[in-house]
């Protein structure tokens, strides 16, 4: 699937993550800001890539501002951003959820 518009999900509050998805052309590109990036950057990126893969999104620019979010929060925020970016908020993919 292809991203139709730029979308944001999440907040900048403690224990949350803000994810912005935009159209990409060369795979999935990340801009990650996190106090724990040295320790968890690969895990954060992996969770987001896996979630994008569930929707068949292969090209995207992902800007992530992490404030210590747990894996399940990262996945939930990514799912929300994807649905907004695909303009499918009213038509969720129940197989993915």
Curated annotation (Swiss-Prot):
It is found in: Cytoplasm. Its main location: cytoplasm. Keywords: Cytoplasm, Phosphoprotein. Coiled coil: none annotated. GO terms for cellular component: cytoplasm. The keyword Amino-acid biosynthesis does not apply. The modification O-(phosphoribosyl dephospho-coenzyme A)serine is found at residue 14. Belongs to the CitD family. Oligomer with a subunit composition of (alpha,beta,gamma)6. Covalent carrier of the coenzyme of citrate lyase. NCBIfam families: citD, PRK13253.1. This is Citrate lyase acyl carrier protein. The gene is citD.
